[in-house]
Curated annotation (Swiss-Prot):
One of its GO terms (biological process) is L-tryptophan biosynthetic process. GO terms for molecular function: indole-3-glycerol-phosphate synthase activity; phosphoribosylanthranilate isomerase activity. Keywords: Amino-acid biosynthesis, Aromatic amino acid biosynthesis, Decarboxylase, Lyase, Tryptophan biosynthesis. NCBIfam families: PRK00278.2-2 (NF001375), PRK00278.2-4 (NF001377). It holds the Pfam family IGPS. It comes from the Bacteria. This is Indole-3-glycerol phosphate synthase. It catalyses: 1-(2-carboxyphenylamino)-1-deoxy-D-ribulose 5-phosphate + H(+) = (1S,2R)-1-C-(indol-3-yl)glycerol 3-phosphate + CO2 + H2O. Belongs to the TrpC family.
């Protein structure tokens, strides 16, 4: 499936046109937000309408309202799907959300070309996702440098230890995401975090992604050593996403108050 998505993305890039830059954009640091989270573990809450493996996740989809509810519930950052073909996302969702909340915005897409980085800047992203299994390590590093040169941060995602080690042979990402879902098979296991995390350098922020739907799951990856989690589907399936965040953290820790 990953190969199919990348092939589609390459075709899309051939006809990609850049929009005018969003005006008066204030950049917000994803790494800083995750290093000083509202709770004992950081939360990147995801705005996602659909996925290739699960189909339509949220028919009643109002991205800005969802993002505002996430912010109210104490999320540290917001991830926005912008891939249209497979996730029913849109670049406009990210721009609208950027102008509505005061949190760092992660662009969740399949970034494989420099032009997508410029596009990310223009639509208002604060950070982008770079997928280790989708790119040669050298190419990923070049895109990483390009992003930081343009004022964006990167969440570098891996699923396997081997992918991580290939990247670490070249550089150490500031934020490393461990995807518990295999993007080739879509099989998900939280054990992936436990297997990969011992090989992550101590200075990197560690984000556990996918398969986190209960407070028990949250505690599990926190025990493994994750600094933050990225949660999408389990929140999006709840009518009240604000309440869903409180429920997710119920057994971990209540939100820090005044």
């Amino acid at each position: 499936m990953l190969e199919q998505i990348i092939a589609t993305k390459k075709k899309e890039i051939e006809t990609l046109t850049l929009s005018k830059p969003l005006q008066n954009v204030q950049r917000r640091s994803l790494s800083a937000a995750l290093k000083k989270p509202n709770r004992s573990i950081g939360l990147i809450a995801e705005v996602k309408k659909a996925s290739p493996s699960k189909g339509l996740i949220r028919p009643d989809f109002h991205p800005v309202a969802i993002a505002k509810a996430y912010e109210k519930a104490g999320a540290d950052a917001i991830s926005v799907l912008t891939d249209e073909r497979y996730f029913q996302g849109h670049r406009g969702y990210l721009s609208d959300i950027k102008q509505a909340v005061q949190l760092p915005i992660l662009r969740k897409d399949f970034i494989i070309d420099r032009i997508q980085i410029e596009e990310s800047v223009r639509i208002g992203a604060d950070a982008i996702l770079l997928i280790g299994e989708a790119l040669p390590a050298k190419t990923l590093y070049e895109l990483y440098q390009e992003a930081y040169d343009k004022g964006l941060e990167c969440l570098v995602e891996v699923h396997q230890r081997e992918t991580l080690e290939n990247i670490l042979d070249i550089f150490t990402p500031e934020i490393i995401g461990i995807n518990n879902r295999d993007l080739h098979t879509f099989v998900t296991s939280l054990e992936t975090t436990s297997k990969v995390i011992p090989f992550v350098p101590s200075g990197s922020v560690i984000v556990s992604e996918s398969g986190i739907s209960t407070s028990h799951d949250l505690k599990t990856v926190q025990t493994y050593g994750a600094d933050a989690v990225l949660v999408g589907e389990s929140l999006m399936r709840k009518d009240d996403v604000e309440a869903a965040i409180y429920e997710l953290f119920r057994e971990v820790e209540s939100i820090a108050g005044p």
